[in-house]
Amino acid sequence: MRPRFALLFAICLAALAGTALPACAQDNYEIQVYGYDLVEPHHTMVELHSNFTIDGSKTIQDGVRPTNHAEHETIEITHGFTDWFECGFYIFTSVQNGDGWDWVGDHIRPRVAIPKKWKWPVGLSLSNEVGYQRPRFSTDTWTWEMRPIIDKQSGRWYWSFNPTFDKSLHGATVNQGFVFSPNVKFSYDFTKKITGGIEYYGSVGPATDFLPTGQQQHQIFPAIDLNLSPKWEVNFGLGVGVTHSTDHLIAKMILGYRFDF
């Protein structure tokens, strides 16, 4: 089977798998595997992350609202300062029947990268994200995410690996160590305008003592990127949860635009 058709078959298979997998709950405000590239110096990227939980948790757990039929809208604004540094800011919101539109919290995300002029064999950058979320949306109100980013474009093929580590700074799990949350993306350029691939998002528990499989979170997103122009970013996908601790079915879309300021 030719590589492009093998990948297309895998995307379709993963999408169909959603009809037979169990459900549960976790936060889903920005669903994205990061690439190495930074926003260019003196430019600003504005993104809207829209995520709708088609089938999620249906009861309040530890004071946190259920995710079923929740629409999460996140605004991300990132400015490039140099060829090795950018900084992003997030505004998280949630919309649910009967509760209206709620502000969830804000995060700030500085990121550094190996400059392209060094010509390393892979892209390498490091993101650190710190922020607050209201108790009704998370049992941990202040958190820190440390995300190394490694990626590579080889012809039409692309892969990215984000071995992410999360830490509570205030809340229910503040005494717990770093939680390992790996994210992975494989994609293929079917045409100059259309890229298809698979995105994986996981959270397996403390880095030194993984949780039992049933308590871990694992999501698989068949996803499409539309390469409309260098200024636009368009990504959408349908995610399937494959453990009882993961929301069963989520639709996501990212729409971004690069401004020359």
Put a short name on every predicted segment.
Residues 1-10:
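Bacterial N-terminal signal peptides that target proteins for export
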